[in-house]
Every structure is written in structure tokens, then in C-alpha cells.
Amino acid sequence: MKTAHLVVVVCFLAGALQTAVALKEEDCEVCVKTVRRFADSLDDTTKKDYRKIETSFKKFCSGQKNKEHRFCYYLGGLEESATGILNELSKPLSWSMPAEKICEKLKKKDAQICDLRYEKQIDLNSVDLKKLKVRDLKKILNDWDESCDGCLEKSDFIKRIEELKPKYAHGEL
């Protein structure tokens, strides 16, 4: 009887750990959103055949731009793609696997798939600069074509943005 309880507890803990480690949409946003949008564009007969899914994905990719285009390149959905792991998308889609799980599998094959990120639009009037990551602070300065020579700490970047804010954010006020 104790062994049965122990097995149940171990299974529960393993399930809880897997849920905690599961990929979130924001961890792999371009992949998840692109896979969802592509899956929603498929009809029921196409969804059942992985070969039709691959053909449809190549057509889908031909009309993509920016981050989605790069995602297609990584998967092998473009003619100029150097590698092809398209079956890692098409077969799970034919099994009705959720986009998050598909992207989790794709990340294991090629980690740069989840490195793709959409550009964040930052409202300088309402955002607390202290809560932003350093890369976002650098992006603000880069968008303004400004640099921060000698900036090492987050506080240095924040100070530089605060100095330049009147010059660049006047249209947003």
C-alpha cells in the first residue's frame, strides 16, 4: 500500500516539474505565434497529412516577412534554407499537438528558433525604466541613434536615457 502511495506521489511531482519547465509563449514568441497562425490556416484534410502540411507551410512561408521569414528559414520552409527540420513541425501538427509543445521540440533541435523575438514598442512616458532589461535600454538608445560610452551598469543606461528623453520623447508627451 505504501508503495502505491509513493508511486502516486512521484508521478505527481514529475508532472508538476514538467509543467514548471514547460515552454511559455513569451519564451519562444515568434515560433508559437507563427505555428498557431499557420495551424489555424489549415483545413481539416490538410491537418491529417504531414506531407500536405509541409507543402502548405512552404506556401505560407513564401508570403512571410521579418521574424516569421527567419523562422521559416530555420525550419526549411524556404528554398534558400540551409537545413530542414520541417518534419519536426508537420508531424506533430498532424497529431494536433499544441504550438507550445511543437516549439519546445523545435527548440531542442535548433535553439536559435526561440531566440527570435518581436520588437517591443516601449512607451517612455508610462514605463518604469528600472524594470526594463539592459538590452531594452540599449535598444531605446539604439533607436535614437545614440550611444552610452562608458555605461556598464543598468543605472548608467537609465541615467543616459533620462538625459536624452526631452530631446527624443517630446512627440510622445
Curated annotation (Swiss-Prot):
Keywords: Developmental protein, Disulfide bond, Secreted, Signal. Disulfide bonds join 28-114, 31-103, 61-72, 148-151. InterPro entries: ARMET-like (IPR045333), ARMET_C (IPR019345), ARMET_N (IPR045332), EF_Hand_1_Ca_BS (IPR018247), EF_hand_dom (IPR002048), SAP_dom_sf (IPR036361). SUPFAM superfamilies: SAP domain. Residues 1-22 form the signal peptide. GO terms for biological process: dopamine metabolic process; dopaminergic neuron differentiation; neuron cellular homeostasis; neuron projection development; synaptic transmission, dopaminergic. Its main location: secreted. The keyword Signal applies. GO terms for cellular component: endoplasmic reticulum; extracellular space; synapse. It is found in: Secreted. Belongs to the ARMET family. Required during the maturation of the embryonic nervous system for maintenance of neuronal and cuticular connectivity. Essential for maintenance of dopaminergic neurons and dopamine levels. This is Mesencephalic astrocyte-derived neurotrophic factor homolog. It comes from Drosophila ananassae. The gene is Manf.
